[in-house]
């Protein structure tokens, strides 16, 4: 949610500039937006992509076209390497969405993404970092946060796309 993102930015000591989701689908509009940031002194865009795909290639192309350097710290890292980074940097992420509760048990909603969850996903042969959208998580704390996000859990919601538990800040 916007409130979560704003609170994450606050705890990082950074500003956040929300961009409507549809902007990414409009190449011209997105590149124009990136150029505006370039003109304000931005040099880099950090992307969280792990695997090469259409979206990651678009991100790279758009950044380079706008004169910005894409930084992809997770690019082509193994799932185990990513788990090790989560542990090393004390990242606390809460599982907030499960695409198919027949595949990943709903009991994991609201739990931390940790080695126990990682090993369970490996055991049931689901991508351990959810790269195909099997689950989503929300970061609520990390070693670079000023303090942990203060949140409560909302009511579990069942949709055609999966099951989710909102975090309320």
Residue ranges and their predicted role:
Residues 32-33, 37, 142-143, 168:
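Extended interaction regions within the primary functional domain
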Residues 96-154:
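A conserved mid-domain beta-alpha-beta active-site/ligand-binding segment of alpha/beta enzyme cores
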Residues 1-95:
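ATP-dependent adenylation/nucleotidyltransferase module used to activate substrates
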Residues 70, 93, 138-140, 165:
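Generic structural hydrophobic/aromatic packing signal, biased to beta-strands
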Residues 11-13, 72-75, 98-101, 121-125, ...:
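Short, surface-exposed, polar/charged, turn-prone segments marking secondary-structure boundaries
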Residues 151-169:
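C-terminal accessory domains and tails appended to enzymatic cores
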Residues 88, 133, 158-160:
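A generic structural signal for short, non-catalytic loop/turn and secondary-structure boundary residues
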């Amino acid at each position: 949610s916007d409130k979560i993102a704003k609170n994450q930015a606050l705890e990082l000591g950074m500003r956040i500039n929300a961009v409507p989701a549809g902007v990414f689908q409009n190449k011209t509009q997105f590149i124009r937006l990136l150029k505006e940031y370039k003109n304000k002194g931005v040099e880099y865009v950090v992307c969280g992509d792990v695997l090469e795909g259409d979206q990651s290639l678009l991100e790279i192309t758009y950044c380079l076209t706008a004169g910005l350097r894409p930084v992809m710290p997770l690019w082509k890292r193994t799932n185990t390497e990513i788990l090790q980074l989560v542990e090393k940097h004390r990242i606390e992420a809460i599982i907030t969405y499960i695409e198919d509760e027949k595949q990943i048990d709903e009991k994991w909603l609201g739990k931390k993404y940790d080695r126990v969850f990682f090993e369970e996903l490996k055991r049931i042969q689901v991508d351990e970092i959810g790269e195909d959208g099997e689950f989503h998580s929300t970061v609520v704390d990390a070693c670079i946060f000023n303090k942990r996000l203060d949140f409560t859990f909302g009511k579990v919601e069942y949709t055609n796309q999966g099951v989710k538990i909102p975090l309320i800040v």
